[in-house]
């Protein structure tokens, strides 16, 4: 019974002209689908794959450039900070040097003024002593003259 269903008229393996016609339709449909659907879709998929690959490569390149620029900028910032610190240190040294020079000049001026005042005081003292000696001699002579005149 099963053999009749499989090989009989209208069965599963009926070898009349329908089978080759169906095979021809399948081949024809495959060529049509390949020409109208699979090739364009394959092309679009390949184009997108190329686009994605290119975009990823460009993104990696840009990322590498950005990292390189970041490193360069960090180095520039580091060197700028070092230069600024050096400038600050030099300015502090210059300021300290100017302070010391100004202090030395002020001390020298103060010492010179003190020495000048001491010399003036000494000169005035010597002058006063000389005048007092002269006055004392005159007064002594006057006293001696009066004592001699009173005798």
Curated annotation (Swiss-Prot):
Transmembrane intervals: 18-38
Membrane topology summary: Single-pass membrane protein
InterPro entries linked to this entry: ATP_synth_b (IPR034679), ATP_synth_B-like_membr_sf (IPR028987), ATP_synth_b/b'su_bac/chlpt (IPR002146), ATP_synthase_B_chain (IPR050059)
Alphabetical keyword list: ATP synthesis, CF(0), Hydrogen ion transport, Ion transport, Membrane, Thylakoid, Transmembrane, Transmembrane helix, Transport
Compartment list: Cellular thylakoid membrane
One GO CC term on file: plasma membrane-derived thylakoid membrane
GO MF term set: proton-transporting ATP synthase activity, rotational mechanism; proton-transporting ATPase activity, rotational mechanism
Alphabetized Pfam families for the sequence: ATP-synt_B
Coiled coil: none
Family: Belongs to the ATPase B chain family.
Function, in words: F(1)F(0) ATP synthase produces ATP from ADP in the presence of a proton or sodium gradient. F-type ATPases consist of two structural domains, F(1) containing the extramembraneous catalytic core and F(0) containing the membrane proton channel, linked together by a central stalk and a peripheral stalk. During catalysis, ATP synthesis in the catalytic domain of F(1) is coupled via a rotary mechanism of the central stalk subunits to proton translocation.
Subunit relationships: F-type ATPases have 2 components, F(1) - the catalytic core - and F(0) - the membrane proton channel. F(1) has five subunits: alpha(3), beta(3), gamma(1), delta(1), epsilon(1). F(0) has four main subunits: a(1), b(1), b'(1) and c(10-14). The alpha and beta chains form an alternating ring which encloses part of the gamma chain. F(1) is attached to F(0) by a central stalk formed by the gamma and epsilon chains, while a peripheral stalk is formed by the delta, b and b' chains.
Record protein name field: ATP synthase subunit b'
Annotated source species: Prochlorococcus marinus (strain MIT 9303)
């Amino acid at each position: 019974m099963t053999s009749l269903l499989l090989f009989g008229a209208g069965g599963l393996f009926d070898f009349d002209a329908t089978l080759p016609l169906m095979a021809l339709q399948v081949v024809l449909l495959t060529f049509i689908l390949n020409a109208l659907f699979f090739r364009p879709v394959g092309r679009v998929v390949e184009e997108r794959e190329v686009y994605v690959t290119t975009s990823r490569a460009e993104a990696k390149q840009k990322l590498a450039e950005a990292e390189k620029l970041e490193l360069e900028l960090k180095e520039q910032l580091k060197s700028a900070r070092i230069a600024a610190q050096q400038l600050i240190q030099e300015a502090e040294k210059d300021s300290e040097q100017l302070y010391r020079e100004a202090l030395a000049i002020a001390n020298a001026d103060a010492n010179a003024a003190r020495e000048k005042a001491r010399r003036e005081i000494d000169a005035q003292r010597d002058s006063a002593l000389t005048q007092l000696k002269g006055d004392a001699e005159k007064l002594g002579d006057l006293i001696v003259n009066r004592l001699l005149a009173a005798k």
